[in-house]
C-alpha cells in the first residue's frame, strides 16, 4: 500500500489566470450533490442513502468564510447526511430540498443585501444553470454536466 501524499499544487499558469477573478465576490452559493460529493449515491437494502464528502472541499469552504466570503448551500435534496456535513462545517446559510434553486438563491441575496455580480456559484447540473448564468463568477467541477461546464468562467 502506497503512503505517498497526493500532489495538490496548482500549475503556475492557472494561478496567474485566476488573479483578480474573485474581486468583488462577497458570497458563494454552492450545490451539494456533485459539488461537495462525487455525485454518487450508495443505497442500502433498507433504502438509506449514503454520500461521500471530500475533506478538501470542506476546508475550502472554511477558507472562504475566513476570507470574508459567505458560503451559502442551496441543494435540491434534503438528507440527514447533507445537514450533518453542513453543520460540521459550521455553515449557517443553507436551503435544503430546494425545488426551485433560483428562488432560494434570490431569497439569500435579498436577505444578505447582495447582487448577482457579488456572488460566485458552484454547480454541476441542469438545476444549477439558472444560478450559474447570473453569477458574477461561475464554477463547475471537472465532472459536471457539459452545459454547466460551458457557462463556467
Where are these predicted regions, by residue range?
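Non-catalytic pre-domain segments flanking phosphatase-related domains
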Residues: 1-30
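Asp-based phosphoryl-transfer active-site loop
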Residues: 22-40, 132
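Short, well-ordered beta-strand core segments
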Residues: 28, 71, 94, 138-140
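Basic, amphipathic juxtamembrane/active-site segments
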Residues: 40-63, 142
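Substrate-recognition element of Asp-dependent hydrolases with the DxDx(T/V) motif
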Residues: 61-85, 95-96, 132
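Short, acidic/turn-prone active-site loops that include or flank metal/cofactor-
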Residues: 97-102, 143-146
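Conserved Lys-Pro-Asp/Glu-containing loop-to-beta segment of HAD-superfamily phosphomonoesterases
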Residues: 102-129
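Acidic, Mg2+-coordinating phosphoryl-transfer loop and its flanking beta/alpha structural elements
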Residues: 120-153
Amino acid at each position: 500500500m502506497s503512503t505517498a501524499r497526493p500532489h495538490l499544487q496548482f500549475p503556475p499558469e492557472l494561478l496567474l489566470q485566476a488573479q483578480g477573478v474573485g474581486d468583488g465576490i462577497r458570497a458563494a452559493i454552492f450545490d451539494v450533490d456533485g459539488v461537495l460529493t462525487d455525485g454518487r449515491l450508495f443505497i442500502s437494502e433498507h433504502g438509506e442513502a449514503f454520500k461521500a464528502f471530500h475533506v478538501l472541499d470542506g476546508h475550502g469552504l472554511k477558507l472562504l468564510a475566513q476570507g470574508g466570503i459567505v458560503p451559502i448551500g442551496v441543494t435540491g435534496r434534503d438528507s440527514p447526511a447533507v445537514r450533518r456535513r453542513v453543520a460540521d462545517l459550521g455553515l449557517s446559510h443553507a436551503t435544503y430540498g430546494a425545488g426551485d434553486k433560483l428562488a432560494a438563491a434570490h431569497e439569500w441575496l435579498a436577505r444578505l443585501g447582495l447582487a448577482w455580480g457579488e456572488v460566485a456559484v458552484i454547480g454541476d447540473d441542469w438545476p444549477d444553470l439558472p444560478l450559474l448564468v447570473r453569477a458574477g463568477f461561475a464554477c463547475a467541477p471537472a465532472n459536471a454536466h457539459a452545459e454547466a461546464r460551458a457557462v463556467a468562467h
